[in-house]
Amino acid sequence: MTILPERSVTLTRSRNAIERYFSRQNIQIKNDNFGNTLSATVTLLNRESGTKPISGCGKGYAEEASVGALYEAYEHYRSFPALREKSRLYPFGSVIQQAELRGMLPLTILAKSSPAKIAAVEFTDKKGCASLLWPLFLTDCEYFSHIIQGDTTDYSAARRYTSNAGIAAGYGFTEAAIHAIGEIIERHCTGILLAKTFFYGTQKEVRLVNTDSLPPAAEKLFNDAQSALEDEINIIDASEPSLPPVYLAYCKSKPRLGINIYGAGCSLYADHAVARAIKELVQLHKLADNFTCFTEELEKHQHNLREHEKLYRSLVADFGSLASVSVELPEKRAELTLQEHLHRLTTLCEMAGLPVWLKEIDSDPAGVSLACAVMPGMERFALVSLGNVVIPCRSYQDQI
């Protein structure tokens, strides 16, 4: 059986591993699939009675979506508790004075109240040498309901900058780490694009991928997605210099409550990045078609941002209103081993002035692993798509 890009084993072996994990944890699994060819699969984990089910959602063709949903459910089950288990309290001053975090927008907001202690997790760089104390709240979206005793920081003014980007599950740490870093780069580039086009208005056009340049497998996926969504799909090249390719996919005429829904994907392999974006686009529309909570969340986002013109424009993300220039998809690069792939990702980030730190936060003898990647220089403005009242972490007003 074929092993998918950025994966270490077949889907069958990957499924067996995660199902063994859930079985040993006495967790019951319920799967629901939405879609015929390309689809969204929702997995619900049911634990002991009286606890709320935990969900995960997968994308792609049926088997891929099903396995992806299981791993995302594992991520949602263990990620935040695992991070908290690895956290400690540190003097606030020593954390924010680290060179890598100096001037970071959410932390400068917190500093105004002069807290004494803050919860942080220690990460190491790609060489396993230099360490970074990473404030827990920046990644743990549920921390505000589980604040560690002794943490004296008032997070109320900065919690809107919290993002769980950078946590990923996989078969083995290397696979999980690749996906964790990819997610951070994806959010970073998406945030920059939204800031330049809709917040500051310094970028007047987007780069649209000429879909005739897609290789056969990506072209088939593209056509399947257009059939599944009954609409024409556009693909935007959102890549930033020196970083791996990032693409956004959106429907030309399928907004939800006036908000354009888009999928995003990042990979060293441009065709795989496009595939991830297209699959996520289908996933989101299938969820919108089948779950009223999706529309309810969009209504909340609108309510939060309607009075903030630039933020509301960034939420709506009307890419079709912008001019465009056609670009070709780059030729596929040579296949790398997973270890080479991970090394290349971290090296590119470092070369771009955006170093990443990694940590395995959970693992199991079955072979499953949870990785957390953090990038202090990540642009967090993509959080506007969740209805958060945020501003770009840096100014793009002078960039054309």
Show where each model-derived region lies.
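Helix-biased "structured C-terminal domain" signature
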Residues: 1-400
